[in-house]
Amino acid sequence: MKVREILVTSALPYANGDIHLGHLVEYIQTDIWVRSMKAQGHKVTYVCADDAHGTAIMLKAEDNGVTPEQQIANVQAAHEADFAKFLINFDNYHSTHSEENREFSELIYRRLRDTGHISTRDVEQLFDPEKQLFLADRFVKGTCPECAAPDQYGDNCEVCGTTYDATELKDPYSTLSNATPILKTSKHYFFDLPEFEQFLKDWTRSDNRLQVSVANKLQEWFDAGLTSWDISRDAPYFGFQIPDTPSDEPDKYFYVWLDAPVGYMASFKNLCDKRAGTDDALDFDHYWAQENEHKTEVYHFIGKDIVYFHALFWPAMLAGSELRTPTAVFAHGFLMVNGEKMSKSRGTFIKADTYAEHLHPEYLRYYFASKLSDKVEDINLDLEDFMQKVNSDLVGKVVNIASRSAGFLLKKYDGMLTDVCAEPSLLEDITKTGDEIAAAYENREFSRAMRLIMQCADKANEYIDEKKPWALAKVEGAEQEVQDVCSVAINIFRQLMVYLAPVLPELTANAKEFLNINDLSFASRNEWLLGHQINKFKPLMQRIDEKDVAAMVDASKASLTQVDAPTASQDDKMVAKNTAPAATPSSTEQADYIGIEDFAKVEMKVAHVIACSYVEGADKLLQFTLDVGEAQPRNVFSGIRKFYEPEQLLDKKVICVTNLAPRKMKFGISEGMILSSGDPKTQLTVVTLPDNCVIGDLLA
């Protein structure tokens, strides 16, 4: 077997908050993949870091009365503690606020600049006169310029789905101070992404670099046209200053998304320096130099919401600075809990440390593994199913094999297994299944791997049930058969531990002690324990108690109520502005009426939903393909994602406003608006029509 040299990363958690179960989907997925590849004999290095720059961190530190450096150090310590609880085994964990990251960020920038890929131009932005800083889109709210919905963020409307510039908002206000922002002009630095369009089109479709659905989504962005990427921010900002700026522009900083992916390189370089001169030494250039792209492998595991950065900006930056690009980028979906988005009020927005206080982390590792595939699909943590699956599969099937067999061997045979296997065909069958399991792990088809493993466990339990060693133990002269049956069962249990080791490292470590062995690598699955003595059996896993799950949910409600309570000093103005009741015109006052001729201008048609899907990179939008009775279906974006699963709206008849001017959005062209009712902050309901409504008919 050729030993592959592989570098693996997970997306960098932002140093501004706690790790929760939604984050852990990715880190558990990556850790399982890394452990499985190491178990198969490959040289795999797994690095990560905290994403430690940006305005949000600067403001959070200010709120907490500490320096940004203290803020990110405190958060990083908490992150590393949480990851350790869930057995995430990084080879190195670093920070983007590091000298290595500064060095590589400046190197990439200078190479891009010197080859003509960086330009500057003046940008008009909203500026908070009280805070004395330029406002990022998410720090501005106002009235949507398209549908007039109030309290919408500065980048897109949650009601109608329209994207816009923050300067287009009506009645804007700063979410930081409640002040009315003013317009100011500043020179910004741009990376010329369109210059790399052909390279990116080829790259995204070559060598299985991306999942098919991701490549298809990127094609939509190509069709809409790539735009230059703003890579600069103005002071005050926590991050790295852009080098070599003119003397009249001293306070320009790299935008956080420029140096964040560079953090992968920085963490790896930090590890290379730590290991220099040791037997485990690593050569940075061997993995990142352009000429070594086909000698080593680099894989990024990410969430589907940051595909745009990792599959467009990042490879273009690397190619433009003459560094190697990733071998592949693997995207995953989001976590739902009990079929819905994680909810603070329902106690299903569960922090990592809250979970670990009540339940064993390996329960979650197994459950996630049983749900994860190579697809970009959301997974659902159904708490009832979670309890049943763990108790049934791990306790009732796997651990039960050892517990029901070890007692006979320890009591009557001093823990000795037989010298000859009584059922070689059964063990050979389970050994052969290991090839399928190994392939499933490598292909990130973890749910398939878990199904195959449980099928092996079922065979073992069926064998034990058929042979009934508890009954044989009472039969005079059947001593050898009892030892034979239990020895076969223990050997199957050992094979299952080989297969489950990437998912359940703590369980398998305890199993090694019980089995009196040192090796559970994939290569060892061909080895049988013959004439071997096992140690005393201790319970390896406890059943999940429903009370513990309930306590975890209750604790999540309590802790998040405390964390989310706003302070009066910051939020009173905001609450006053946003919750004051609107004045109601008296009968003698003139309201803002429109004439019938104005309403008649709005064209609304019966539309049939023929396709509905999530929008990569947009956590509020759903994308619809609508038949409105025209020659071609229409593409429409709607900001209702948090209220619906796409499949809930398939084949429905809805109302579409069809004579709105097409709107160019980041994700494509929106050719209409779907009507909904309700409060966009709490619940929107799509207005649906009876089946007997005719597609394309006008509403009047």
From Swiss-Prot:
Assigned keywords, A-Z: Aminoacyl-tRNA synthetase, ATP-binding, Cytoplasm, Ligase, Metal-binding, Nucleotide-binding, Protein biosynthesis, RNA-binding, tRNA-binding, Zinc
CDD domains referenced in this protein's UniProt entry, alphabetically: Anticodon_Ia_Met, MetRS_core, tRNA_bind_EcMetRS_like
Cofactors: Zn(2+)
Coiled-coil positions: none
Chain span(s) of sequence motif 'KMSKS' region: 341-345
UniProt: Zn(2+) binding residues: 144, 147, 157, 160
Binding residues for ATP: 344
Free-text cofactor note: Binds 1 zinc ion per subunit.
Subcellular location: Cytoplasm
GO cellular component, one term: cytosol
GO molecular function, one term: tRNA binding
Gene3D superfamilies the record matches: HUPs (3.40.50.620), Isoleucyl-tRNA Synthetase, Domain 1 (1.10.730.10), Methionyl-tRNA synthetase, Zn-domain (2.20.28.20), Nucleic acid-binding proteins (2.40.50.140)
Record bears the keyword Nucleotide-binding: yes
Family, as annotated: Belongs to the class-I aminoacyl-tRNA synthetase family. MetG type 1 subfamily.
Summary of the function given for this chain in its UniProt record: Is required not only for elongation of protein synthesis but also for the initiation of all mRNA translation through initiator tRNA(fMet) aminoacylation.
UniProt-recorded name of the protein: Methionine--tRNA ligase
